[in-house]
C-alpha cells in the first residue's frame, strides 16, 4: 500500500516542480517554455508501468501454492491500465488479468495467438470469465484458487478485461466518466489496446481474437469495427468468438415463445398463452414501425419477463407449495430453477466463491490493486448499464456483415439450454443478415457433427453441430447453458481449436464429423500428432476397442465373415492387438472398407515396404511348405531325375508367384494412392467452401403472432425439413425448427 502512495506522491511533487519552472521561465523564453512543456508531458507519461510491474506471483494467490503440478501454473500479469492521454491511473482505467501457458502444451499457432475475453451485462465483470469459465483458474467454496483443466490459456494467451469503465475493478473518477454509447466504449477499448501493447510489446505481432459472451455480442463487433477503422494502433485482428451473443435484442426477443414451446416450457393450451402472443405482436409491430433503427424496444424486452412470470410454479401438481428457490425457470439454463423474480440471477453456484476470493487479505495487492482506490468486487454494476443506453448506435447485427466481408472469422457458439440468447433466435438473426452477396447461410453451407474425444480413454462424446458459410461459423453446444465454458470447459476449447484449424475431420456413421480433444495438434506444436484416419463406429467408439468388439458381438456384427476377412488381412495387426490391447482402426478392413490414410509420402512408402515384406514372408512360408512336402515323400517313390525336375518346376513357380504378387501389390497401392490422395492430404481448413445463393426469408408481419397460435402444434412436432447433403441424413435447418440436436449421434 505504501508503494502506491510513495509513487503517486513522487509523481505529484515532480509535476508541481515542473509547473513552477515552466511558469518562471515562460516569462523569459518561448523555447525554454516549450522545452519544459515537453519535459512535463514526458514526466506524466511515465505513469505507464512496465510489464514486470504487472507480474503476479502464484504464491500470493490463495490455493496456488498448494498446486500439485507447479509446471501447470501459468504466468500471470494483472493490474490497471489507464485510458486517458496522460496515463493517469487515478482517473478512468481498465483492470486486466492475463494468463500465459508455461506447460509447453500449446501448439505453434496457439503460442502466436492473443485472446481478449469480455463478459457482458453490460457492466458485468470479466472476472466471471477468468475464474468461472475460460480462465486458467477456478475458485472453491473456501475462496481458494485451483487450476482449471479446461482453461483457454493453452490455446493462446488470454487477457480478461473489466470494461466499460466502472465495471468490476475498472474505475471512473466521477459519474460523468460513465459511457453512454457503444461508440464511446469502442474508443476507450482502442485506447486500452494502445497502452496494453506499449506495456506488452511482444504481443503486438500475435494474431488477435476478441472473445466473450452475452452482451459482448455488442461489444466485440463494435470494437472490431473501431480497430479496423483506425490506424493509430496496429492490431492483427483475425477472429471474433461470441458465445450466446446478444447481437440483435429485438429480433432475438421474437424467439422466446417459439423456443419455450419447443422445449416444453409452455403449451398452447396454457391460459396465459394468448397473453404472451399479444406481447409478441406488440414487439413485432415496433420492429415494423418507423422506429426500427432503435437499439432495443421495451415491448420486446417485456416478452421474456412475461414468460418467466406466467411459467412460475408456486404449487406442484399435488397442490403442495414449491420451495421459493425452485419457483422460477433459470433464464440462463432451462434445466435449473431459481427464486422469483431472480430467475437465474443467483446463478452460477460458484459465484459466491469469487467474492470470498477477492475478499481474502492480500489478494488485491497481489493483483496490483490499491484497496483504498478500488471498491469491493461486485459481479455487475448497475450504473454502467443505466448509463449505456446507446442513443447513437444500432444493434451489432448491422455491423457483422461488414466485418465478415472484411475477412474476419466470426464464430457464434451457443449453449443449447440457454433461454435469453437461445439457438433459435441467433440462427434467425443469421438468416436475416446479408453479406458476400447472399442472405443467411447459403445452400452450400457446410454442415458437421461435432464430438469431443476424452484424453483418458478416447471415448467420444457428442459436443454439438457446426455450420459454416462465408467466414461465419455457428456452433451449437450440447448440454450447455448461457455460459458455455462454465458447463463444458474442455468442450468449449473446441471453439478456439476450430479457429486454429486444430481439429480432426473424420467420418462417423457416414457423417462428416469434427473431433476436438484435450491435446493441441498444431503443426508446430509439441504435442504428438494424432491419426486422423481412424474410422469410428460403435456409437463413436474406436472400432478396435474391447467395448466396441463386445457391442458388435452382441449385435451379431462380428461373425464369421468379419473373422475370415480379418484372417486375410495383415497378421501383424493381430499381434499388435494382442500386445497393445488396441491399434489404429485404420489398419483393419471392415466389410471391404479401405484404410483411411492421410499421410501421402512416408506412409505410402512404408505401406509398399510392408507389402513387400508380406510377399517375402508368404514366399518363405510357401518354400517351407514345399520343402516339408518333399521331405515327407517316401524314398521308394522317387524316380530318377524326377527330383531335379520338381525342383526346377518349383523354382520357376516361386519366381512367377513372386512377380505376380509384386505386380498386383504395386497396382493396388498405386490405385489406392491416386484414388484417395486428394481426400487424405495433410489437414486442410475443414470449413472453406464458397457459398451459392439462398432466397431471403420473407419478413414477418404482425399476423405472425396469430399464425404461431394457430400452428403452435407445428413447433412441438415440426416436419422433417432436414437438408440432405452428401453423407448427411438428418441435419437441422432454420426452416425445420427442429430440436437442434442430431438424433442417434
From Swiss-Prot:
The species this protein was found in: Lachancea thermotolerans (strain ATCC 56472 / CBS 6340 / NRRL Y-8284)
Designated name of the protein: Pheromone-processing carboxypeptidase KEX1
List of glycosylated residues: 471, 479, 552
Swiss-Prot/TrEMBL GO biological process terms: apoptotic process; proteolysis
Active site (record annotation): 214, 418, 482
Any one cellular-component term (Gene Ontology): membrane
Catalyzed chemical reaction(s): Preferential release of a C-terminal arginine or lysine residue
Topology term for the membrane: Single-pass type I membrane protein
Intervals, Lumenal compartment: 48-655
Main subcellular localisation: Golgi
Classification lineage: Eukaryota, Fungi, Dikarya, Ascomycota, Saccharomycotina
Amino acid at each position: 500500500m505504501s508503494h502506491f502512495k510513495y509513487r503517486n506522491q513522487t509523481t505529484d511533487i515532480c509535476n508541481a516542480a515542473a509547473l513552477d519552472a515552466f511558469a518562471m521561465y515562460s516569462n523569459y523564453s518561448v523555447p525554454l517554455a516549450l522545452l519544459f512543456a515537453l519535459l512535463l508531458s514526458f514526466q506524466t507519461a511515465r505513469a505507464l508501468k512496465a510489464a514486470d510491474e504487472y507480474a503476479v506471483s502464484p504464491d500470493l494467490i490463495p490455493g496456488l501454492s498448494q498446486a500439485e503440478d507447479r509446471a501447470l501454473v501459468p504466468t500471470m500479469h494483472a493490474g490497471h491500465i489507464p485510458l486517458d492521454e496522460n496515463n493517469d491511473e487515478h482517473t478512468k482505467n481498465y483492470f486486466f488479468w492475463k494468463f500465459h501457458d508455461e506447460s509447453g502444451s500449446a501448439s505453434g499457432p496457439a503460442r502466436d495467438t492473443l485472446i481478449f475475453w469480455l463478459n457482458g451485462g453490460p457492466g458485468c465483470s470479466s472476472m466471471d470469465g477468468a475464474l468461472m469459465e475460460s480462465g486458467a483458474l477456478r475458485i472453491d467454496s473456501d475462496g481458494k484458487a485451483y487450476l482449471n483443466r479446461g482453461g483457454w490459456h493453452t490455446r493462446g494467451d488470454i487477457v480478461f478485461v473489466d470494461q466499460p469503465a466502472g465495471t468490476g475493478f475498472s474505475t471512473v473518477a466521477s459519474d460523468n466518466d460513465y459511457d453512454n454509447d457503444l461508440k464511446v466504449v469502442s474508443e476507450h477499448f482502442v485506447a486500452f489496446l494502445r497502452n496494453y501493447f506499449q506495456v506488452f510489446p511482444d504481443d503486438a505481432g500475435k494474431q488477435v481474437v476478441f472473445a466473450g459472451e452475452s452482451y459482448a455480442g455488442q461489444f466485440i463487433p463494435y470494437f472490431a469495427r473501431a480497430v479496423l477503422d483506425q490506424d493509430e494502433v496496429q492490431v492483427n485482428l483475425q477472429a471474433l468468438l461470441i458465445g450466446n451473443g446478444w447481437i440483435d435484442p429485438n429480433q432475438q426477443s421474437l424467439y422466446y415463445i417459439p423456443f419455450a414451446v419447443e422445449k416444453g416450457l409452455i403449451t398452447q393450451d396454457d391460459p396465459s398463452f394468448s397473453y404472451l402472443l399479444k406481447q409478441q405482436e406488440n414487439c413485432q409491430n415496433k420492429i415494423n414501425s418507423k422506429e426500427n433503427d432503435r437499439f432495443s424496444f421495451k415491448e420486446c424486452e417485456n416478452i421474456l419477463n412475461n414468460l418467466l412470470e406466467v411459467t412460475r410454479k408456486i404449487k406442484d401438481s399435488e397442490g403442495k407449495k414449491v420451495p421459493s428457490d425452485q419457483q422460477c425457470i433459470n433464464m440462463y439454463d432451462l434445466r435449473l430453477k431459481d427464486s422469483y423474480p431472480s430467475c437465474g440471477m443467483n446463478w452460477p453456484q460458484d459465484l459466491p466463491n469469487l467474492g470470498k476470493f477477492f475478499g481474502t487479505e492480500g489478494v488485491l495487492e497481489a493483483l496490483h490493486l490499491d484497496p483504498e482506490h478500488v471498491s469491493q468486487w461486485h459481479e455487475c454494476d448497475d450504473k454502467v448499464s443505466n448509463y449505456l443506453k446507446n442513443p447513437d448506435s444500432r444493434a451489432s447485427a448491422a455491423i457483422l456483415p461488414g466485418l465478415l466481408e472484411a475477412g474476419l472469422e466470426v464464430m457464434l457458439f451457443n449453449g443449447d439450454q440457454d433461454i435469453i440468447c437461445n439457438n433459435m433466435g441467433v440462427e434467425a438473426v443469421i438468416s436475416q443478415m446479408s453479406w458476400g452477396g447472399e442472405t443467411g447461410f447459403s445452400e452450400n453451407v457446410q454442415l458437421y457433427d461435432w464430438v469431443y474425444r476424452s484424453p483418458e480413454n478416447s471415448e467420444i462424446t457428442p459436443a454439438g453441430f457446426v455450420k459454416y458459410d462465408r467466414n461465419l461459423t455457428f456452433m451449437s453446444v450440447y448440454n450447455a447453458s448461457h455460459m458455455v465454458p462454465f458447463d463444458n470447459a474442455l468442450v468449449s476449447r473446441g471453439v478456439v481449436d476450430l479457429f486454429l484449424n486444430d481439429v480432426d475431420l473424420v467420418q462417423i456413421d457416414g457423417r462428416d464429423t469434427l473431433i476436438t480433444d484435450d491435446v493441441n495438434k498444431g503443426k508446430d506444436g509439441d504435442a504428438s500428432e494424432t491419426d486422423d484416419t481412424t474410422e469410428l463406429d460403435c456409437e463413436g467408439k474406436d472400432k478396435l476397442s474391447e467395448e466396441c468388439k463386445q457391442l458388435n458381438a452382441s449385435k451379431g456384427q462380428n461373425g464369421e465373415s468379419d473373422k475370415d476377412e480379418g484372417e486375410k488381412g495383415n497378421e501383424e495387426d493381430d499381434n499388435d492387438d494382442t500386445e497393445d490391447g488396441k491399434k489404429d482402426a485404420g489398419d483393419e478392413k471392415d466389410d471391404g472398407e479401405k484404410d483411411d490414410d492421410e499421410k501421402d509420402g512416408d506412409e505410402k512408402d512404408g505401406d509398399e515396404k510392408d507389402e513387400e515384406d508380406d510377399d517375402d514372408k508368404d514366399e518363405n512360408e510357401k518354400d517351407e511348405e514345399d520343402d516339408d512336402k518333399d521331405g515327407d515323400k517316401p524314398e521308394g517313390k522317387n524316380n530318377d531325375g524326377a527330383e531335379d525336375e520338381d525342383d526346377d518346376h518349383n523354382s520357376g513357380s516361386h519366381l512367377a508367384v513372386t512377380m505376380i504378387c509384386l505386380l498386383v501389390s504395386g497396382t493396388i497401392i498405386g490405385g489406392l494412392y491416386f484414388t484417395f490422395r486428394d481426400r487424405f492430404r495433410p489437414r486442410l481448413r475443414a470449413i472453406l467452401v464458397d457459398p451459392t445463393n439462398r432466397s431471403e426469408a420473407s419478413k414477418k408481419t404482425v399476423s405472425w403472432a396469430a399464425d404461431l397460435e394457430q400452428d403452435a402444434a407445428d413447433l412441438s412436432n415440426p416436419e422433417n425439413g432436414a437438408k440432405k447433403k452428401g453423407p448427411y441424413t438428418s441435419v437441422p435447418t432454420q426452416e425445420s425448427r427442429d430440436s437442434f440436436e442430431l438424433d442417434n449421434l
